[in-house]
Amino acid sequence: MQKLKLYGFNNLTKSLSFCIYDICYANTNDSRNSYISYIDEQYNAIRLTKILKKTCSIIGANVLNVFHQDYEPQGASVTILVCEEPINLEKVNIVNKSNKIISSSVLAHLDKSHICVHTYPESHPQSGICTFRADIEVSTCGIISPLNALNYLIHQLESDIVTIEYRVRGFTRDIHGIKHFIDHKINSIQNFMSHDIKSMYEMFDVNIYQENIFHTRMLLKEFNLKNYLFNINVKDLSKKEHSYIIDLLWKEMREIYHGKNISMIKKI
C-alpha cells in the first residue's frame, strides 16, 4: 500500500489485545497452591515490565511513564505510557518505589499510547485443573503499529491457548481531506505471524472486516502430558489416571479455545 500523505497527525487508534492461558494439573490443594505461587513468580511485575519495555523498543515507541505492581495473594499489573515522538525528559513523569511522582509535570495527552498487562492465576475447586491467564493490550496512535510486536509477545509468553484481537478505530485525513479508516492492508492477524508460530498452533479467525476488527484463536498442537503435570511424575500414574488427566486437560483447553463449555471429550 502506498504511503499516505496525511493532513496533520495520524488519528487512527490501533489496539492489539492478547488473552494468553497456561494450563496445568495438580492433584492436591498444596500442589495447586504451589503452582499458583510458582506461576505468579514466573510472571511477576518486574519480568512483565522487561517484556513490555522490549515491546516498546520493537514497535519504535518511546517510554513516558511506567507503573508496575505485584498483588496479594497473587496477580500483577504493568502499565506503560508511550509516544512516537522523541522524549522531552523535563515533561516525563518518573514514579519511584513509593509510587510518588518525582517530576512536577502531569501527563494529560489524549494522543499518547499505552501498553498494559494484568495476570490472573486460578484453579478449579475439585478437578485439579489450574489456569493462568494474562491479558495484554498494546494500543497506539499515529504511525506506530502494535502488530510489529506480535511474534515477540507470543514467543515470550509460551502459552497453551492464545486469543488475539486487533482493531483499528477512528479515521485520519489525507492532504485532500479524504477520510481513511485504516492505513494498511490486512485480512487476518495470521498475515503477521511467523512460519514457526503458524506451525506450532491450530488457529481459526473470526473477523468483522467492515468494522476493522480481526480476531484469531490459537491452540498449541503439541500435547505432552508431562509438560502439564505439577509435582507429579507421569511414570507414577496408572493407565486409568493417565487417560483421565489427559481427557480433563484436553476438555479445559478446548473450552477455552472455543470459548464455551463442552462435554468431556477424549484426546485423539
UniProtKB/Swiss-Prot annotation:
Similarity annotation: Belongs to the prokaryotic AdoMetDC family. Type 2 subfamily.
Species assigned in the record: Buchnera aphidicola subsp. Schizaphis graminum (strain Sg)
Swiss-Prot/TrEMBL site (Cleavage (non-hydrolytic)) positions: 112-113
GO cellular component: cytosol
Post-translational modification: Is synthesized initially as an inactive proenzyme. Formation of the active enzyme involves a self-maturation process in which the active site pyruvoyl group is generated from an internal serine residue via an autocatalytic post-translational modification. Two non-identical subunits are generated from the proenzyme in this reaction, and the pyruvate is formed at the N-terminus of the alpha chain, which is derived from the carboxyl end of the proenzyme.
Note accompanying the cofactor annotation: Binds 1 pyruvoyl group covalently per subunit.
Gene Ontology terms: biological process: spermidine biosynthetic process
Pathway linked to the protein: Amine and polyamine biosynthesis; S-adenosylmethioninamine biosynthesis; S-adenosylmethioninamine from S-adenosyl-L-methionine: step 1/1
Signal sequence segment: none
Its biological purpose: Catalyzes the decarboxylation of S-adenosylmethionine to S-adenosylmethioninamine (dcAdoMet), the propylamine donor required for the synthesis of the polyamines spermine and spermidine from the diamine putrescine.
Designated gene of the protein: speD
Cofactor: pyruvate
Name by which UniProt lists this protein: S-adenosylmethionine decarboxylase proenzyme
Pfam families, A to Z: AdoMet_dc (PF02675)
Tagged with keyword Lyase: yes
Assembly behavior: Heterooctamer of four alpha and four beta chains arranged as a tetramer of alpha/beta heterodimers.
Alphabetized UniProt keyword annotations: Autocatalytic cleavage, Decarboxylase, Lyase, Polyamine biosynthesis, Pyruvate, S-adenosyl-L-methionine, Schiff base, Spermidine biosynthesis, Zymogen
The EC number(s) this enzyme carries: 4.1.1.50
Enzyme class: lyase
Matches recorded under SUPFAM superfamilies: S-adenosylmethionine decarboxylase
Gene3D superfamilies per record: S-adenosylmethionine decarboxylase (3.60.90.10)
Domain of life: Bacteria
Catalytic residues of the enzyme: 113 (schiff-base intermediate with substrate), 118 (proton acceptor), 141 (proton donor)
Pyruvic acid (Ser) PTM positions: 113
Reaction(s) catalysed (UniProt annotation): S-adenosyl-L-methionine + H(+) = S-adenosyl 3-(methylsulfanyl)propylamine + CO2
